[in-house]
Amino acid sequence: MLKIRFMSISKQELGRTLKRYKGVGWDQSPIFKKVYEEEYGQFGGEPFGCLVGDYYFDHSPQDVELLGEMAKIGTASHCPFIAGTAPSVMQMESWQELSNPRDLTKIFQNTEYAAWRSLRESEDARYLGLVMPRFLARLPYGIRTNPVDEFDFEEDTDGATHGNYTWTNAAYAMAANINRSFKEFGWCTAIRGVESGGAVENLPCHTFPSDDGGVDMKCPTEIAISDRREAELAKNGFMPLVHRKNSDFAAFIGAQSLQKPAEYYDADASANAQLSARLPYLFACCRFAHYLKCIVRDKIGSFRERDDMERWLNDWIMNYVDGDPANSSQETKSRKPLAAAEVQVEEI
């Protein structure tokens, strides 16, 4: 069953709260107690599957600090944190400037991004997901676009004035995909790709007269993102929402967490690091962590020997192993996210 809970707290208040418990006392903050102790760490609790913040983050010291604290809570609770990205993270005033830089990676090599790079290299950063740009929340009010029954109102939008439109945090679009995947498959793994869960459909499309006498359409995702730029953004730890030209359709092509995957001499180890930094794989691992803890907590005392519990857990987890991942359908992979699995129970 899908359950959604809301917490009314501003970004500034959240930052101040977590800052008071910074350091060794981070696990005493009311946010940690609400997310971890009252659910994941409580008998009968229902662990959170994902946290979504209607905030925008950049590389400022206070934002890096706040993201780091939320990453700690997410790691302890096995609960990713999804939020929006401010264009100022790339020294821009608007996402409409995204096509201007020749190389995005060079921006993050500047000295002022030292703390940002350190955050990305941390293990906890895999529990952070930053999406961008925003998407159009609704059509402008007007007789021909979005009539208001109570009174005659024409919203002043001409296509060129970007700030006059009503934009929404793309974190909501990702959250909708996560919820849809959970509803259809019971897992939050089908959240990326045009045909595999990453689609964002029926976006508002506003057309307006162009200067040359034709008709133009306002890009419902602020700016069109090329394939090359999308790959650059994913490499730098972002999840761009990419609009399909001349349509009301967009998609999250990838679902890369903020973490920069570690590189090893061993190719297999590097490949594993790449996978662990992607949200679909992380969501599957988090859900298994939730279930295993709850199952073991409930089963304590039901088995006489450690081997009995280990055998029972292995029988349970095999229900989610795809026996033929090379040939199975996307739906089967979404319902059975594992290619192989083994549970080991150790006495301490």
Predicted regions and their residues:
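Extended, regular secondary-structure scaffolds
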Residues: 7-24, 40-221
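Short, charged beta->alpha transition segments
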Residues: 28-41
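Short acidic, glycine/proline-enriched loop segments that cap or flank alpha-helices
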Residues: 38-43, 58, 62, 280, ...
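Generic beta-strand/beta-sheet core signal
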Residues: 82-84, 252-255, 346
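Long, contiguous, structured domain-core segments that constitute the functional module of a protein
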Residues: 154-312
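Short, hydrophobic/π-rich interface segment
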Residues: 308-326, 333-334
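Short, structured protein-protein interaction patches enriched in aromatics and acidic/basic residues
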Residues: 326-348
